């Protein structure tokens, strides 16, 4: 509940003076006049000292501690005395954090390690205003450093006149101690709601990524003054912080960030270096022995285990300062953010919290019986609210009708402002609603207002990092029948944290189309349905038993996934999964999948892989550990007919040497590769593709290609490749990784590896296809492609025309490119269209005509409905559409227009 608790007896000041610390203690002396006196935890350090801090370099009239007199007695009646236990958690066994005691009720959001967690929402609210430290949410990027009070130092350097290396005793006893109540909030609080709309790059925070404590430490301002911080005129413009943990970001770094000097020196902001939380030394997860506290800001600015404070001219150049805690525009995805350097634009950095509120009562799945007793009384809805920058929450409203009308809530604000009028803590709200009114409601929503009249938006605003989500918090109200003869109202929160199931957004996601679920917002197919795998563990031998289409398991980064249900839906066809079923394919999965695809994988996680010893690694499992007897045979790939087949095992990489390279244009190359044996054929069925594999800059890179050579060519195969060079396209300044690598290969001395066959489509001849394992016949083919997407079409065209006159399939090709110079295989296509006018018709579409004097007679612009109606047949039972091109072309130019032409997009449309 969020109601104030019964007052408890005060913990009166001891009669004797504080004693010096005993050897081996943490160095914190006790004090009696703590502002949280009576709150149920021990009092703290000796009273704040008055007077100057040291030789001061600027006026400091506001240094005294009088501002806290207003709230010293305020919190005792709001603290629950129940102890939240901490113990060694079995989930930490085998990790670098196995030495840390933690509260077992914390909900883990990122697996076993590192710890990222939030408390159960009901348990958090049960404790009211002050959150017990063991229950406080945790955001860790890596293993927790082992801090030692006696040896820990904080270096203060940079643009200061007196650089110093301060010990913990000096911080605790050499500066006036400030005690600040502050609510900490992760910028990702409520992120799972965003992940239900479109997967962000972040994990699933629920609505309990928020906690409140009373923090004690030295004021940052005092420390900087002691060290002689230079003025703005001396170019001292920023204060940078660096922690102690070793993290992988940026190739290896500490966690670091910065704030402006103006903020750091502002006494009204109460910025401190805390070494105590709720009257006790910091817990390891919260930064022991010392951290940074910036009230009113996101938690990501408050560096834990702080080691260095550097006064600089420029803001921090730390990897995590730029690649974390940003709100980028909704159209920016991970690829665009990296390609166009959105991370470094200062306008998108997050500092202060925004206004937010959450309904905590009723809880998720709580049932309110509807009977003669309950309908005669009101039901109390409760929750919390907060804002940033020291702004007070002044209003909270609840609506039962989607915002048509609002009810004003009663506010419970235990906090008193500091002497500058700033509020750093959450508040609680409640409103009584007649049960009969709830019975007629579909949902309940809440919004809060702060003193600047900022409020929350109605609709969710998606962003790549999933941060600062503060749309109206809505719970659904549904009628249920919990017992015979009785009805009730069941309340449904939008999500449940981490991988927990439940929530109306997750349910809605299964029921609605992407457009209905997120109007006006591009929805990604990578959005994961939350898995419920828990911590079930499997050995590699168990995984190897699941290598068939009946049961296809894979291992990626130590997680085990059952992809059987996804075989029919995989964009690359079932073969793309079956080729690695029953094995660890971490390296290959990372080599070919985007971040969105990696997020989708979470849907199918069933547990964790048990590793035994240090000899296990993914390479061994991928290439040597699995038996093909568990792999469903891929059609034609394992059949030996006439010449031996190079692609005899879809799991094995086949080394192929480059024997010829032709430069067809400034960016188009025809590569010819020799098979391992001169009497082999590649063994690739028409419609399938191969993976080209290469190690580039120490990492495996894999890309799909369709050979343009005849399927029965002996001893070699050819790849037609458009090379995407560096610095040619502003959105992709680095160019194509694989195509530039292929361009660098030397004839005669360079090799690549290939794997296959892969793909969900196979043309078996004379109008017959096998699509996702099912037979399909077509008399007419509508082929629409762009750029290098011509290669799978070319393969089918080649097969049809080689089987003349028996194969009577009609092919209608619409081929789009940027200019006439970019059309691949044009000579062959034009020749075939002339030689076989009843079988093949070709129409070109280009963005721009480079040589109008040549008399371009085809279309200019985009692929439109009019072009398709004029040059491909209308949909029907005997017509099949084949498409291959950039995703926007498929989504906006091809699919909607074919649908208008009566194509059955579920059964008569294939995208390679």
From Swiss-Prot:
Biased composition (Acidic residues): 54-68
GO-annotated molecular function: FAD binding; heme binding; molybdenum ion binding; molybdopterin cofactor binding; nitrate reductase (NADH) activity; nitrate reductase (NADPH) activity; sulfite oxidase activity
Keyword line: Disulfide bond, FAD, Flavoprotein, Heme, Iron, Metal-binding, Molybdenum, NAD, Nitrate assimilation, Oxidoreductase
Cofactor: FAD; heme; Mo-molybdopterin
Annotated ranges, domain Cytochrome b5 heme-binding: 535-610
Keyword DNA-binding tagged: no
Residue intervals of the FAD-binding FR-type domain: 651-764
Pfam families the UniProt entry points to: Cyt-b5, FAD_binding_6, Mo-co_dimer, NAD_binding_1, Oxidored_molyb
Catalytic activity: nitrite + NAD(+) + H2O = nitrate + NADH + H(+)
Residues involved in Mo-molybdopterin binding: 186
UniProt-annotated binding residues for heme: 570, 593
EC number: 1.7.1.1
Example of a GO biological process term: nitrate assimilation
Top EC class of this enzyme: oxidoreductase
GO cellular component, one term: organelle membrane
Low complexity composition-biased segments: 13-23
Residue span of region Disordered: 1-99
Tagged with keyword Cell wall biogenesis/degradation: no
Binding site for FAD: 703-706, 720-725, 732, 737-739, 788, 791
CDD domains xrefs: cyt_b5_reduct_like, eukary_NR_Moco
Note on cofactor: Binds 1 FAD per subunit. Binds 1 heme group per subunit.
Family, similarity comment: Belongs to the nitrate reductase family.
Known partners and oligomeric status: Homodimer.
Function: Nitrate reductase is a key enzyme involved in the first step of nitrate assimilation in plants, fungi and bacteria.
PANTHER family: NITRATE REDUCTASE, SULFITE REDUCTASE
Entry protein name: Nitrate reductase [NADH]
């Amino acid at each position: 509940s969020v109601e104030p608790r019964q007052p408890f007896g005060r913990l009166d000041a001891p009669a004797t003076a504080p004693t010096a610390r005993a050897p081996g203690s943490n160095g914190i002396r006790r004090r009696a006049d703590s502002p949280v006196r009576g709150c149920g935890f021990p009092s703290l350090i000796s009273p704040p000292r008055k007077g100057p801090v040291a030789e001061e370099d600027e006026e400091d009239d506001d240094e005294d501690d009088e501002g806290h007199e207003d709230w010293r007695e305020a919190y005792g009646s709001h603290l629950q005395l129940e102890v939240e236990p901490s113990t060694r958690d079995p989930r930490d066994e085998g990790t670098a954090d196995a030495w840390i005691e933690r509260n077992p009720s914390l909900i883990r959001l990122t697996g076993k390690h590192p710890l990222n967690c939030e408390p159960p929402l009901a348990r958090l609210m049960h404790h009211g205003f002050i959150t017990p430290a063991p229950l406080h949410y945790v955001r860790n990027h890596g293993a927790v450093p082992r801090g030692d009070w006696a040896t820990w130092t904080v270096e203060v350097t940079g643009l200061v006149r007196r650089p110093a290396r301060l010990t913990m005793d000096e911080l605790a006893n050499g500066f006036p101690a400030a005690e600040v109540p502050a609510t900490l909030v992760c910028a990702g609080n409520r992120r799972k709601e965003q992940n239900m709309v479109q997967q962000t790059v972040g994990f699933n925070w629920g609505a309990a990524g928020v906690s409140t404590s009373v923090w004690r430490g030295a004021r940052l301002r005092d420390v900087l003054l002691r060290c002689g911080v230079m003025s703005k005129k001396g170019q001292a413009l920023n204060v940078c912080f660096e922690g102690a943990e070793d993290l992988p970001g940026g190739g290896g770094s500490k966690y670091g960030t910065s704030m402006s000097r103006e903020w750091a020196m502002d006494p009204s902001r109460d910025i401190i270096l805390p070494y105590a939380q709720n009257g006790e030394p910091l817990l390891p997860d919260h930064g022991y022995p010392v951290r940074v506290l910036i009230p009113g800001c996101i938690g990501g600015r408050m560096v834990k285990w702080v080691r260095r404070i550097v006064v600089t001219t420029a803001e921090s150049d730390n990897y995590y300062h730029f690649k974390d805690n940003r709100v980028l525009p909704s159209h920016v995805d991970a690829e665009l953010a990296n390609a166009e350097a959105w991370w470094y634009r200062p306008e998108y950095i997050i500092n202060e919290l925004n206004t937010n509120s959450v309904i905590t009562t009723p809880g998720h799945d709580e049932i309110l019986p509807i009977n003669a007793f309950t309908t005669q009384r009101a039901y109390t809805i409760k929750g919390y609210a907060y804002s940033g920058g020291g702004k007070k929450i002044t209003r909270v409203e609840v609506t039962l009708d989607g915002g048509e009308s609002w009810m004003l809530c009663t506010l419970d604000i235990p906090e008193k402002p500091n002497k500058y009028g700033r509020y750093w803590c959450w508040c609680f709200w409640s409103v009584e609603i007649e049960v009969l009114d709830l019975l007629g409601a579909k949902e309940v929503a809440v919004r809060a207002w702060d003193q600047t009249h900022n409020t929350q938006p109605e609709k969710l605003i998606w962003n790549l990092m999933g941060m600062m989500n503060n749309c109206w918090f809505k719970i659904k109200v549904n009628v249920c029948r919990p017992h015979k003869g009785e009805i009730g109202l069941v309340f449904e929160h939008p999500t449940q944290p981490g991988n927990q199931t439940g929530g109306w957004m997750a349910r809605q996601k299964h029921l609605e189309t992407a457009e209905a679920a997120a109007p006006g917002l591009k929805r990604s197919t990578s959005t994961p349905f939350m898995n419920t795998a828990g911590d079930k563990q499997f050995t590699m031998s168990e995984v190897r038993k699941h290598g068939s289409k009946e049961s296809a398991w894979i291992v990626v980064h130590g997680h085990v996934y059952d992809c059987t249900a996804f075989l029919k839906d995989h964009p690359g066809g079932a073969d793309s999964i079956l080729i690695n079923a029953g094995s660890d394919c971490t390296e290959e999965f990372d080599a070919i999948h985007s971040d969105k695809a990696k997020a989708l994988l979470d849907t199918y996680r069933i547990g964790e892989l048990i590793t035994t010893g240090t000899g296990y690694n993914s390479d061994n499992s991928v290439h040597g550990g699995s038996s093909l007897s568990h792999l469903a045979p891929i059609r034609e790939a394992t059949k030996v007919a006439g010449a031996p087949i190079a692609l005899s095992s879809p799991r094995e990489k086949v080394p192929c040497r480059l024997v010829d390279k032709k430069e067809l244009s400034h960016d188009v190359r025809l590569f010819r590769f020799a098979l391992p044996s001169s009497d082999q054929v590649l063994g690739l069925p028409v419609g399938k593709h191969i993976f080209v594999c290469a190690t580039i800059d120490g990492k495996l890179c894999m890309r799909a290609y369709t050979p343009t050579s005849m399927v029965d060519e002996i001893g070699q195969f050819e790849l037609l490749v458009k090379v995407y060079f560096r610095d040619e396209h502003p959105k992709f300044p680095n160019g194509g990784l694989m195509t530039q690598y292929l361009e660098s290969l030397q004839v005669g001395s360079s090799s690549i590896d290939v794997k296959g066959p892969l793909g969900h489509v196979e043309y078996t001849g004379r109008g017959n296809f096998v699509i996702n394992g099912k037979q399909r016949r077509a008399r007419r083919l509508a082929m629409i492609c762009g750029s290098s997407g011509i290669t799978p079409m070319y393969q089918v065209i080649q097969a049809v025309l080689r089987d003349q006159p028996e194969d009577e399939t009609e092919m209608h090709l619409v081929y789009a490119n940027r200019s006439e110079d970019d059309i691949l295989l044009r000579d062959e296509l034009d020749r075939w269209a002339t030689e076989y006018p009843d079988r093949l018709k070709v129409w070109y579409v280009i963005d721009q005509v480079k040589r109008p004097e040549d008399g371009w007679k085809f279309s200019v612009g985009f692929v439109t409905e009019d072009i398709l109606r004029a040059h491909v047949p209308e949909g029907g039972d005997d017509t099949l559409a084949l498409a291959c091109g950039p995703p926007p072309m498929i989504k906006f130019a091809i699919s909607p227009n074919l649908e208008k032409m009566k194509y059955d997009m579920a059964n008569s449309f294939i995208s390679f």
